[in-house]
Amino acid sequence: MVSVKPLPDIDSNEGETDADVYEVEDILADRVNKNGINEYYIKWAGYDWYDNTWEPEQNLFGAEKVLKKWKKRKKLIAKGLLEPFDAEDNEAKKMKREKEILRQQRQKRKSELTQLSQKVKEKFKKMRKKPARRIVTIANDEEEEDDQTMDEDAFERKSMQGELKERNLTDKTSTLSTSFGETSPDVNPFYLSEWPTVTDSILLSKSLSSDAIPLKNGEIKSTMLMPSDSDNSVPGIQNSNNLENTGAFVENANSPQSNTPLSTFRHSSPLSLSPVITSDNDVANSLFFSNSTPLPSSLKIKKEAPKLETHTILVSDNSGSLTKQDILSYFAFIKGNIEVFFLKSPKKDKVCNMAYIQFDSIEQAKLAYDKGHPSWHVTLVKGKISTDMEECKVSKSILKTTPSKKANARSVSFTQTTTDTLSESEKFASNVDLDENFDFNVNVTNEDAKQLKKSVIGSSWTTVNNDWNSVSKSDQTFENDGASKVVPAGNITLNSDNSLHHSISESEDLSSASTLSDYFRFVLRVGKSLYYAGELSFDISKLKAETEHQQLLRSLVSCKQVDVLRFVTSQYLEVFGTCLTKVLSGSLCIRSDVDMTHFKNILNRGNGAGIVLGSNYTLLLFTEDNNALMNLYDCQGQSNSPFWMVIFEPLESILVEWSAKNLRPKKPYHKSQSYLSYLLQLGHIDLHKIGAFQATQILIVSKQPSPEAEELEDTFREAAIPTFRGLEIPESLFLSQNVFVFLNVSLEDDFDQLQFLTLAKRKSCKFFLFGLSLPLKSPNDSHVGTDFKKNNEPLDKLTYSQYLRPMFPKGGVVSVTLSALIKTPRLLELISPFLEIKKDSWILILPPSIVDMVKSYFVTNNPDKSLLEIQNLLNTLQRYLTNPALKNVTLYQDWDIVIDDSADVSLASTLQLYQKKNYDKYRRFVLIHELKNELTPVNGLDIVDYDEFKETFMRAIGLK
């Protein structure tokens, strides 16, 4: 059980890892990461809990036994017999521990620097009290000449020192010695008493420039040599050729004591240092020197906690290799959504190396800022960044670098301006609502289109729109400030039916960006074969270079030559190497009544994938947010377009028979037809015996935007039905009569957390579950196979279906707690008439150990209870559990039992779990309980005593 695992050492320098062979002790959890790869949460042998890591299966060499053990335990977890390991909580504790270690290290360093500062100040005070030493004249002629020169130098230095005293700056000067306070015997005392050292010059400055460049380990690099004639200038430093080894040493950031000597020098002109210290107390807390050069020309500053409260950071990379995938993978340890917004380069021939990164919370942004990056510059940015390119135009003069003629320093400033004045065409384009308007009578001009960038594609790809040299210069227009203008996608005109049409002349180069749609990036996939459900296969290697398929490319820019396969959310496209396998093996629908503009809009909103069937090609469409597909097809590069389109050989001829069976009808809606029937005809949605209905209000509830929810909403809007979609539903919308609520399958495990799923709402509303189902074990299964393992079944037996299932249809479930049985031993006999009348719609469900629970209670807590009552209760329980005629009496399964210290609480939690699994069978879930022993209310459960049950349920059907 060994595996290669690089374990980071928190106490070592950042970036260092120790790659070695480690033993896998246990697997605690598993997950599918953003790239669609299955990972396991590993407990390593000989390491503590804070060394647990997520590892892909390929890293677990020789751990087959542990994997088998984990698969067995996972089955028990799925059945509720074992509690799952909380990996997220463990990761949070790890992060908290790392922060605490870093805090202690910072505190220790701060304490050491404080002591150092105090010693320096005390030493300097003693030195200031010493009188200046006089120069003794020696008879020797050569020594007289040397002494005379030294006297002149001393006079010059005294004059400068007096000038500094007049500016009230000398009280802030200090010096450093070899042992932090002890004078080296090799150092001339004259220089120590009469001349300010390099450190003195630094301490005279008030603060370091906030524009300094961030470095690795959260430090900031600032160049000290900045000649200036400002008033606060102080004597500077000569270059290393004039160094005099005085034996003075300064503490280094990476070692206890540096071997780099510091000395004092003269310079022909004063030098100005960037402000570095905000107060006197910050002197020792912010300064230490780098050992990278003999001179202290690179000054490192300890990174203090940022005071700026923001969700956004700005990242730049001088190497120019910054990509979205690099950013997302580097900050993958941060939970939640991460939005990346790249800035356009001011120069059209260069790729911009700057990007805004926006997090869900301020704490996440600070965490990313604190971590930094070895080669990136990370800066906090005030405010949130809008990703809407039409409504927020950002000036491209983001990074201005001004070289100084007097020094080798650069001052870097970040500026962001928003263009308030838009052209009329831009204002019009930004107001177009793609959700509502399906006919676009818009005159598209050069200013309205979007610019295409070069796409960087992997070696197995050829790109259609990567030849910028073939675009005429007249088509490439840019403003002076870097704002991009549109390269038109061919000559765009309006047909007689007011639809957009791209006209292409025979002489135009079809591989150029100017002849293709500006909304997509097209790539050709070659050299691979796909297999569909074990039956359909073809060889894509026959597809040649795009220049030999001009007709194919012409058809790509037309909006009228495609049929669209139904939308599929990315969560069901785990590995799109088998993407078409999973799409085509289900009862999904080919659509021929949707235009491409509407399709692209829904695809963008839903973050899913879709397939376009043409006579000469097949297209796979997805957005950049679909990480699994982006990684699988090696899609790279930045562009204004949010879409990728992968071109395959035509599938239409292969799927003729399959398409004919699933072709979506173009039947218009008529008021004489029920809405639900119309919906079923459009989508081939399975429904269990529900009659026609006439809804006055449609509520669509989805955890996140999905193509299923988008399409369902559009269907009802086309039928002119009031429709609302979201998670938080206003209470006023439930006041209408005949309200229908559609819940997406993504919420199936969270029904008990939806506040509107109350008993009162179930009386006045009708609920339905919709969406693309998970794989079923067989087409006849009526429930989603939650314990289905994809490795246990061949692909040709998987069934994916789009369905609409009623929720909480009728009937109910009743259960009784132990306290209720103790109070009323005849409880089961009293409610038996109700169960007999409702035997077709209601059931009584009991724990499998109810008899033992009753015996144990009376023996332990109430031994004086009448033996006759106890025996009668036990006989009743035994009869209910063993009589085959009582078909509506059943027991919980062992794996459905939720264990708790209290038997009543355990039963309430078990009934809540049972409700989540049987929402499509029963409307009411009733727990008869002794109300003196209060239970926490559970959404969707009726917790009543016997009297209330009799009043509410039994009398409603004529029982007294």
From Swiss-Prot:
Domain Chromo: 22-74
Compartments, record wording: Nucleus; Cytoplasm, Cytoskeleton, Microtubule organizing center, Spindle pole body
GO cellular component annotations of the record: condensed chromosome, centromeric region; cytoplasm; heterochromatin island; mating-type region heterochromatin; nucleus; pericentric heterochromatin; RITS complex; spindle pole body
Source organism, top-level taxon: Eukaryota
InterPro entries to which the protein is assigned, alphabetical: CD_Chp1-like (IPR049937), Chp1_domII (IPR056341), Chp1_PIN (IPR048709), Chromo-like_dom_sf (IPR016197), Chromo/chromo_shadow_dom (IPR000953), Chromo_domain (IPR023780), Chromodomain_CS (IPR023779), Heterochromatin_chromo-domain (IPR051219)
Signal peptide interval: none
One Pfam family in the UniProt entry: Chromo
Keywords from the UniProt entry: Cell cycle, Chromosome partition, Cytoplasm, Cytoskeleton, DNA-binding, Nucleus, RNA-mediated gene silencing
Single GO term (MF): methylated histone binding
UniProt keyword Cell cycle present: yes
CDD domains recorded: CD_Chp1_like (cd18636), RRM_SF (cd00590), SPOC_Chp1p (cd21545)
Subunit and partners: Ago1, chp1 and tas3 interact to form the core of the RNA-induced transcriptional silencing (RITS) complex. The RITS complex interacts with the RDRC complex via interaction between ago1 and hrr1. Clr4 has a role in mediating this interaction. Interacts with dri1.
UniProt-recorded name of the protein: Chromo domain-containing protein 1
Gene name of the record: chp1
